[in-house]
Amino acid sequence: MFQNEVTFNEDMGSQVYLDYLYNFDPLKDFFELSPWQESSFEKQAKKLQEREANRRTFRNQLTLGLHNYHKKFTDNPKVYNTIELLNDPETMTVVTGQQPGIMTGPLFAIYKIITAIKLSKKLSKNLDANVIPIFWICSDDHDFQEVNWLKTVDHKGEQLLYEIHDDKEGFSIGDRDIKHKSQDLLDKLAQQLQDSPYYDKWMTLFSKTLEQSKTLADWTAAIILELFGNEGVLVIDPMKPVFRQLSKPIFSKALDLGEGLHNSIDSQTEKLNNRGYSGQVDLRVNHSGLFYYYQGIRSPLTVEGDQFLLANLGIEKSKEDLVRELESDPAKFSPNVTLWPVLQDFLLPSLAYVAGPGEISYFAQLKQIYEQFEIGMPVIYPRESYLLLESDVKSILEKYQIGPENIFYDWPTTRKRVFRELAPINTEKVLNDTCRTIKEEHEKFIQELSRLDEKIYDFEEKNFHLIYRQLYYLKEKGDQYFRRQQLQAQRDLDYSKIKIYPLDKLQEREYNIGEFLCKYDSSVLKKLLKTPLNPQKISVVDLE
């Protein structure tokens, strides 16, 4: 029996991430609160209460905006009851987020939501308050190559890649119409998944949600609400006009800060580097923290003094011009990776943010920005990681006495051990030793028979050759069986590797929840939700 939890190692995350999980003290100066102390959540809740008392919230506008936004995707009363809870000044949120993706994107996006749900329930109980999980869809992002793909594995163990293409260079994901191309992808994917027991149910759902969507952001929101609406999950797409309008104070403050924003990032990054860590965020020089939409293109807005520049286009803008445009049309502005966390924690009563490994690294660079905007950084809580273990893969692991930890930590050594154990003998040596022994006995036998007639020696060599041929035949049969075992072992090991640790990446980064839903129905989500909350280990989830 193998381990049901696996510890992260240096191949699975940066040193910042590993220390955040297992050795927090060296990082405590870069975060306001530790995720490993229950008192951190109490402190953040108290800060949110003080903020509420100072009326620095937008609950009425937020709930109205959320109500109108969700109407497009769902009529689930649980969703609207949850939205109404946000009107209560004591209601808090656990936020997580990710770029939209095909059928929600890689598994880790789903794991973020699962973690947020479980953490919300735990904090609701511990703090005796309503805590709501919210998924922030990073629809502003314009790196389409990060989200335009889906991977699966065929029955031969070959990884298959499905992609949608779009030639709108520089356009935000939330501005790209992908409906027809995504339906084409689903049609191609059908050839791979159509024999799965729950294929019809889930492909109907994916097609239905796509039909009511235009962009990947809408499709992602629709699927998330289908999967987790009953768990109280809400979704925010910051590109929608109501949320852009509410974002104006943050955008305005960024314009006022000018060079101060990227200076604070540089300062915090230098401190991080001096502690022996590497920063995750590598910004363009003089980045203002904002992007500006020009004819649909999301262009970085750099700043020098009071002069701003659309960096990719060479267009200059004065601060006064930008302030006027922000007031009249906030949809022209978009936050960069350093500003969107501040924005979401400005809009929402964020008790905690569920972050992936890379996000934790760049949150370590953001403390001064939070201070500049006078917004408290919430508890940064690591998202959970899972290994979904299918029955065919489990059988292979048991057959060769391998655990997932062997695949993660010492795969070359494990492979050698398996093949060594497959061949407990050297057939050539066994044949030679056996022939030597038989030859000796054969000579004695001939010698005894020669007492009857010495002509028997005439048959000695031919007779032994016949014996040798039979022994050699058996040896060749043994080699044939071994080669067959080797070939099967090769296939088995390659298959288990590409399912568990494809291309030396965690499963969660390569595969999609859709395949598992088609195979195992919603039981896969139920198992994840029942798994005890533990972001410090990779939990092995048996799907049998």
Swiss-Prot record:
Q: Pfam families recorded for this chain?
A: CC_BshC, Rossmann-like_BshC
Note whether Ligase occurs among the keywords. yes
Q: Which UniProt keywords apply?
A: Coiled coil, Ligase
Per the record, the domain of life is: Bacteria
**Residues spanning the membrane:** none
Q: Does the keyword Ligase apply?
A: yes
Q: Which residues form a coiled coil?
A: 431-463
- Quick one: signal sequence residues? none
Q: Which GO terms describe its molecular function?
A: ligase activity
Which EC numbers characterise this protein's activity in its record? 6.-.-.-
Where in the chain are disulfide-linked cysteines found? none
Q: Record's InterPro entries?
A: Bacillithiol_biosynth_BshC, CC_BshC, Rossmann-like_BshC
Function per UniProt: Involved in bacillithiol (BSH) biosynthesis. May catalyze the last step of the pathway, the addition of cysteine to glucosamine malate (GlcN-Mal) to generate BSH.
Provide the family line.
Answer: Belongs to the BshC family.
* Name assigned to this protein: Putative cysteine ligase BshC
Q: What is the lineage of its organism?
A: Bacteria, Bacillati, Bacillota, Clostridia, Natranaerobiales
- Give the gene that encodes this protein: bshC
